[in-house]
Design a protein with these regions (language model features):
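Glycine-rich "substrate-gating" loop/helix at the edge of Rossmann-like oxidoreductase active sites
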Residues: 2-6, 29-36, 54-66
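Conserved active-site helix of classical SDR/Rossmann-fold NAD(P)-dependent CH-OH oxidoreductases
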Residues: 7-18, 70
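Residue-level signal for the nucleotide or nucleotide-sugar donor/cofactor binding architecture
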Residues: 8, 60-63, 91, 122, ...
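Conserved beta-loop-beta element that borders a ligand/cofactor-binding pocket
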Residues: 14-34
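Short beta-loop-alpha junction of Rossmann-like oxidoreductase domains
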Residues: 34-43, 94
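Alpha-helical substrate-binding/gating segment
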Residues: 43-83, 90
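Mid/C-terminal beta-alpha module of Rossmann-like enzyme folds, strongest
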Residues: 69-118, 124
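C-terminal amphipathic/interface module of NAD(P)-dependent oxidoreductases
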Residues: 107-150
Length: 150
């Protein structure tokens, strides 16, 4: 139920935003980097260390906070519409969670088949091809390794 309320709220927010004459809606992937839940001492890291997150077939798309901020600035000059702001590699949690766990020095996660119906990645093709946006951190796997070693 809480997820449905969140999704309904976002849908209403987007619907309301489109009442404006010009609006660009940026749909960000899961943020990582400084100041996010995914930092080495963040909420997600603690859950991974405590083995509270299970690796599944569910797909996620990530975006480094630096790329998210750059997209927001560039979007000031983009035409109205909805644009996904994600890196180049959507991944199952079976792919990203072990790499993340290693980056923070946590044990390997438990693995389970299946996924939630809402777990799916996104594409940045529109941002790249129509607006020339290119992520500075195109790969979550390199991004995880780099920002955790800072």
């Amino acid at each position: 139920m809480p997820r449905k309320a969140t999704i309904n709220g976002i849908a209403k927010l987007e619907e309301t935003a489109f009442e404006l004459s010009e609006v660009v809606i940026l749909r960000y992937g899961t943020l990582y980097g400084p100041g996010t839940w995914n930092t080495e001492n963040g909420v997600i890291a603690n859950q991974v260390r405590n083995n509270e997150i299970v690796a599944t077939d569910g797909i996620s798309s990530f975006i480094h906070v630096e790329d998210a901020a750059r997209a927001a600035v560039l979007a000031l000059n983009w035409p109205s519409g909805i644009v996904n702001i994600v890196d180049d590699y959507p991944a199952t949690s079976k792919e990203w969670l072990p790499i993340y766990a290693t980056a923070i020095g946590a044990p390997n996660p438990k693995i389970q088949t299946g996924k939630n119906s809402w777990e799916r990645g996104a594409s940045n093709n529109k941002a790249r091809k129509e607006y020339g946006w290119i992520p500075l951190h195109p790969s979550w796997s390199e991004g995880f390794k780099n920002f955790m070693s800072v």
